[in-house]
Amino acid sequence: SYGIDCDDNLLSLILAIHEVDGIERIRLGSLEPRIITEKFVQTIAQLPKMCPHFHLSLQSGCNATLKRMNRRYTAEEYYEKCRLLRKYFRNPALTTDVIVGFPGETEEEFAESKAFVDKVDFYETHIFKYSRREGTKAAAMKDQVPDQIKAVRSAELIELSHRKQACLLYTSPS
């Protein structure tokens, strides 16, 4: 994630880009949730070129699954980042990625993740079925989720995502 381990940070880069003539819009994608701080959001909300669209990778709405994925945030911390964006931007489009069927994901964990996706009201959710990749820690984990269960979970989240998106489009001010 740009800005976490580098001397230059993302906010400084955005401010510099904002000053460039000919650049009309700035849109951020695939943000690490830890970058979203009150100072960061407050500052970019003042920039006329900033598009109110933010893609924050969630991966899972269940803390136990996030921990197995070695993510460095909790669902609650992620939700707070979304709240900050909504505090400073009028009707921002929040999009995300969710992985279903990560090793060890139980029905209860999936239900927790699904409820979280429902709660956040994403504009769009990209759903991916976990695929085993040799040489990774996850490939060696016990409790690999069967493909048919991943397919069912994926279909459930896709249906939820489409329903939520339709509601947001229907109720959003023009």
Question: Model-found features: residue ranges?
Answer:
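Contiguous mid-protein beta-loop-alpha structural module that forms a pocket-lining wall or clamp
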Residues: 121
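Internal alpha/beta loop-helix hairpins
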Residues: 124-131
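Radical SAM enzyme [4Fe-4S]-AdoMet core and its adjacent flexible, acidic
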Residues: 3-18, 22, 68-72, 132-164
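Conserved SAM/AdoMet-binding glycine-rich loop
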Residues: 1-107
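Short, hinge-like loop/turn segments at secondary-structure boundaries
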Residues: 44-46, 113, 142-145
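Catalytic cores of alpha/beta
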Residues: 104-117
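Conserved functional hotspot residues or short segments at active or partner-binding sites
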Residues: 167
